[in-house]
């Protein structure tokens, strides 16, 4: 198992869903694909440097987790289907 960090940017435009609910939904989806989440950090709402897909801001959340390298692709694909996720980046931690 390797340690990873995932930065997820949520699209909060036009949604009534609380941020905490979105955070737990994504965590549950990651766990179903074999990730063991060790930490979650809500960095808050931040403005983008430029507009992206008609959005000027997003809710930034960082997940620290451990998983097998083969689990990253299914996690990424599953979260890609969620319309409330604007961007997602993954980094391998040392």
UniProtKB/Swiss-Prot annotation:
Cysteine-cysteine disulfides: none
Cellular component GO terms, alphabetically? Answer: ribonucleoprotein complex; ribosome
Keywords from the named record: Ribonucleoprotein, Ribosomal protein, RNA-binding, rRNA-binding
Q: Alphabetically, which GO biological process terms does the record hold?
A: translation
One Pfam family cited in the UniProt record for this chain: Ribosomal_S6
Q: Which GO terms describe its molecular function?
A: rRNA binding; structural constituent of ribosome
* HAMAP family for the chain: Ribosomal_bS6
Name the protein family: Belongs to the bacterial ribosomal protein bS6 family.
Q: NCBIfam families under this entry? A: S6
| Entry function | Binds together with bS18 to 16S ribosomal RNA.
Q: What is this protein called?
A: Small ribosomal subunit protein bS6
């Amino acid at each position: 198992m390797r340690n990873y960090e995932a930065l997820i940017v949520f699209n909060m435009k036009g949604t009534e869903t609380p941020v905490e609910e979105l955070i737990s939904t994504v965590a549950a989806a990651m766990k179903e694909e074999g990730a063991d989440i060790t930490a979650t950090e809500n960095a808050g709402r931040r403005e983008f440097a430029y507009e992206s897909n008609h959005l000027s801001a997003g809710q930034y959340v960082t997940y620290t987790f451990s998983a097998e390298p083969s689990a990253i692709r299914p996690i990424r694909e599953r979260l890609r289907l969620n319309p409330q996720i604007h961007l997602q980046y993954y980094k391998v931690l040392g």
